[in-house]
């Protein structure tokens, strides 16, 4: 991917990823030695940024982490909100895996709420669930017939952690851009069109918040998916150009890179 070659070419030692999503670009910047700030408004993005960007793999006890993952893997299933909502009222996961998600997620809050391991354990659980879901990749709908992988057993694995420090935040991109000091490299990957990440990945948002929201429709989306507060101006065709202009005028960077595609409104 060409973006990955920009940092060494421009001798950057720091970068800001304002719409980090699943943190893949931020991870690659960190892997190449940059100090990275990863930001997004989604809770699941913040958790992944805490796991991959803020956590320094060289400064943690990997033995303790592996032992904890092994213990969580041994927990029996305990059906709860996740099983009822995403396995019975909808068909994203097999009930056997939904029950284990419920059990593991409860224990993470009960036993690791203040632990340095929490974002790593949550990321591991999210990725484990992703490997046994029955979707095409986004969570706007589930498959009519079960995906083959959905029959596999849920398994927590150690995420691919990186050495070095970094930081994370969960802020509105424009507000954060106005406050940040000048940086060497700014990466911008905002929503392209009407498709909203909040609804595309509503299960991950619920799994990370663990707030048992009211759900609606066949897809069992969070009820707050209807709220204006969960909608981005980048998802609105008329408002998007002006918001993008405001952002570009607000950032302070030696180099700014914007990622878009041919399905975008700009």
Regions found by a protein language model. Give the residues of each.
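Short, conserved SAM-binding/catalytic segment
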Residues: 50-64, 155-164
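Conserved Class I SAM-dependent methyltransferase catalytic core
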Residues: 230-266
């Amino acid at each position: 991917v060409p973006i990955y070659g920009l940092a060494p070419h421009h001798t950057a030692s720091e970068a800001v990823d304002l719409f980090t999503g699943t943190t893949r670009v931020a991870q690659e910047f960190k892997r190449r030695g940059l100090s990275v700030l990863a930001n997004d408004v989604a809770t699941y993005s913040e958790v992944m940024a805490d796991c991959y960007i803020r956590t320094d793999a060289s400064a943690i006890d990997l033995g303790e982490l592996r032992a904890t993952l092994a213990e969580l893997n041994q927990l029996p299933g305990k059906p709860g909100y996740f099983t009822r909502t995403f396995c019975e009222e909808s068909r994203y996961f097999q009930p056997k895996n939904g029950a284990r998600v419920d059990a593991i997620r409860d224990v993470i809050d009960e036993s690791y709420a203040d632990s340095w391991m929490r974002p790593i354990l949550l990321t591991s659980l999210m990725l484990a669930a992703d490997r046994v879901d029955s979707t095409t990749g986004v969570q706007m709908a589930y498959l009519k017939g079960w995906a083959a992988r959905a029959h596999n057993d849920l398994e927590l694995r150690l995420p691919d952690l990186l050495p070095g420090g970094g930081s994370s935040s969960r802020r509105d991109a424009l507000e954060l851009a106005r406050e940040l000091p000048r940086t060497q490299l700014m990466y911008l990957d905002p929503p392209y069109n009407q498709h909203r990440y909040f609804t595309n990945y509503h299960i991950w948002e619920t799994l990370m918040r663990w707030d048992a929201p009211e759900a609606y429709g066949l897809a069992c989306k969070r009820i707050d998916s209807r709220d204006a507060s969960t909608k981005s101006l980048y998802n609105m065709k008329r408002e998007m150009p002006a918001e993008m202009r405001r952002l570009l005028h607000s950032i302070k960077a030696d180099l700014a890179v914007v990622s878009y595609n041919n399905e975008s409104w700009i």
